[in-house]
Amino acid sequence: MTIAVAMSGGTDSLFALVLLKEQGQQVCGLHARFIPPTGHDPVPDIRAMCDRLGVDLHVVDLTEAFEEHVVRPFMEDYMVGRTPNPCARCNATMKFGLLADAAAHVGAVHLATGHYARLLRHPRWGTVLQRGVDPAKDQSYFLSLVPHARLEKAVFPLGNWRKEAVRGELARRSIVPPLPSESQEICFVPDDDYRAFLKDRRVRLPGPGPIVTTRGRKIGSHAGLWQYTEGQRKGLGIAWHEPLYVVGKDMENNMLLVGGREALASPGCVAEEVNLLVPYEDWPAEVAVRIRYRQQPLSARVTLRDGRLYARFREPQPPAARGQVLAVYDMEHHVLGGGVILGPLP
């Protein structure tokens, strides 16, 4: 039974390969080209490392599909004022979609990645996604949109590891990753400058408009709604007698809505594109949710109605950004499901 390991050239995927090989698993490397190389091509270095480890490497070109399923929706989200989460979309459609298909094509039964998350077996639910043990690196949030059937074929060797231990173990083995530095936040956006990326792609974005308080008073002008995110404080360019925050976007009237801290209190949010990883009838009444990465889980009650998730927070929170992911957990840190945030509770 062969396990294909998705090889980016970085620390995590390399150690995932090393771990599986040392466990006696039959493995091969699988590298996906998601974006055309603009500088140094990592493939020769990845191939050399695989040769050193005695592992075959397969390379698959997915640049056109990545443009269609990840880059284009990313640009379209900004055009309508959403704050997209391309990593979650990539995991669902590319890594555990088309790349998993490529793994099967080369004869692999499973696809392993360097994600910091765990997969467990449950007597009723089958494969269950759970948070990784390293709270600083846990990536279950970004995996909550991956269909359950795809997770059945996934392997996460690093789920019980901490990042520093991974680095230390590679160093102890005198293995240097071809790309040792941390990858940037959005792999296809140079220098993580999404504003420059969108302008370079000549994306037609909403123009300037008024900044209006929650009481209806115009107090300035914004540079385009696409440049702001719900809950944002810095970068508004307004001198005011109290700190101001983005509390919403009126796309129809091209208005940026701002208010003081008290205006941030949101009772909950609604999510669409729902992905259930545990049958909804088995969800507990009280769950934990995350509406952004690196956030402590929030106590909430979540209902599924008409194909959407309605999350009501136990305590009001800053508004959830439209386009981000709502991930739902039980108290044992199992991921129950996820969705794409549509807006605040009606």
UniProtKB/Swiss-Prot annotation:
Top class in the EC scheme: transferase
* Positions annotated as active site in the UniProt record: 90, 187
Q: For this UniProt entry, which segments traverse the membrane?
A: none
Where does the record place the site Interaction with tRNA? 115, 324
Q: Where is this region: Interaction with tRNA?
A: 137-139, 292-293
- The record lists its disulfide bonds as 90-187
Q: Which GO terms describe its cellular component?
A: cytoplasm
Task: Output the Gene Ontology terms for molecular function.
Answer: ATP binding; tRNA binding; tRNA-uridine 2-sulfurtransferase activity
Instruction: List the EC numbers from the record.
Output: 2.8.1.13
Question: What are the entry keywords?
Answer: ATP-binding, Cytoplasm, Disulfide bond, Nucleotide-binding, RNA-binding, Transferase, tRNA processing, tRNA-binding
Q: Which reaction does it catalyse?
A: S-sulfanyl-L-cysteinyl-[protein] + uridine(34) in tRNA + AH2 + ATP = 2-thiouridine(34) in tRNA + L-cysteinyl-[protein] + A + AMP + diphosphate + H(+)
What compartments host this protein?
Answer: Cytoplasm
- Gene Ontology biological process terms in this record: tRNA wobble position uridine thiolation
**Which positions does UniProt annotate for ATP binding?**
6-13, 114
**What protein family does this chain belong to?**
Belongs to the MnmA/TRMU family.
Report the NCBIfam families cross-referenced here: PRK00143.1, trmU
| UniProt xrefs under HAMAP family | tRNA_thiouridyl_MnmA
Q: What does this protein do?
A: Catalyzes the 2-thiolation of uridine at the wobble position (U34) of tRNA, leading to the formation of s(2)U34.
> What's the protein called, per UniProt?
tRNA-specific 2-thiouridylase MnmA
Q: What species does this protein belong to?
A: Nitratidesulfovibrio vulgaris (strain ATCC 29579 / DSM 644 / CCUG 34227 / NCIMB 8303 / VKM B-1760 / Hildenborough)
Q: Which gene encodes it?
A: mnmA
